[in-house]
């Protein structure tokens, strides 16, 4: 299938970790001379596609931030959007010599409607752990001929559901300069993540509240549906136990932000599949304190980071303090992290391997 045309399908027009991987795959496929179509809603993702790529507009295929009765109504509307998207996808998926790659869980039902049985590869960026995810995955399962998971932890639930699974890891730029060393005064803890509830910002704020000598920087944007959550975080940051110690950076260059940090935290309360923010920090040799589940556990194993029990602000505060207090630990963790990234997550190797797994 070396010369096959590729159709990528995404549920959102926004850009976060999964869409950054999609853009790298698209660039690699364009470099191979393949005809490429990306079907997704309008937005930053479509705006960042190379000129050689055809964009086909889909309706948004995810749930918004509604709750209660509004969420029920939203789910009904989502069913209609899946049907509309499936009709748009049908002629694209059924063109001769086209391989379809679905980049997000919430696009699966539309792909099933558009292509029928065993019609697509699925690049799995979500660890399927809750009922909503399992329901959507079950709807889309007949359409998937192969699931390409970005970590073993992400592949395991799919194997249990009967999917044929292969693992192709995420990657980050390598080599990159080492960061860290002498602590800032006062020490700075950083987190690079979309401002959305499952990323665990509440847990991190409560942890830093227990560390009065530490400052916190939160880098990352937010989607409109999470405006209430962002307001909650901003209010928490002004409470007496945190006032003046928390900065919201918004969208920033990750390396530039991390240059001012001593410890990087990944506080997700649900398992991450293959978090790029963790790999980026590790590539720079910064010590990562991360929730001990999902792909994060795999990345931090063997001394390449410091895991803590997910959702536990007391344990997180203790882990941060331990890292700040021990220069030798920071150095050894940074060494192990950089060696791990060099061996397993160099994007120059991972993207071609992932593209081959999806297209073959």
What do the PLM-derived regions correspond to, one by one?
Residues 19-24, 196-210, 229, 314:
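A conserved mid-protein helix/loop that constitutes part of the nucleotide-sugar donor-binding site
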Residues 302-314, 322-328:
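Conserved acidic donor-binding segment of nucleotide-sugar-dependent glycosyltransferases
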Residues 322, 329-343, 350-353:
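A short, well-ordered alpha-helix in the C-terminal region of glycosyltransferases
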Residues 225-230, 243-251, 257, 307:
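Active-site donor-binding acidic/aromatic loop of nucleotide-activated sugar
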Residues 40-44, 216-232:
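Glycosyltransferase donor-sugar binding loop
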Residues 7, 172, 182-199, 205-211, ...:
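Conserved donor-binding/catalytic core segment of Leloir-type glycosyltransferases
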Residues 287-290:
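Short hydrophobic beta-strand element within catalytic cores of glycosyltransferases
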Residues 85, 100-108:
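Short His-centered aromatic/hydrophobic patch
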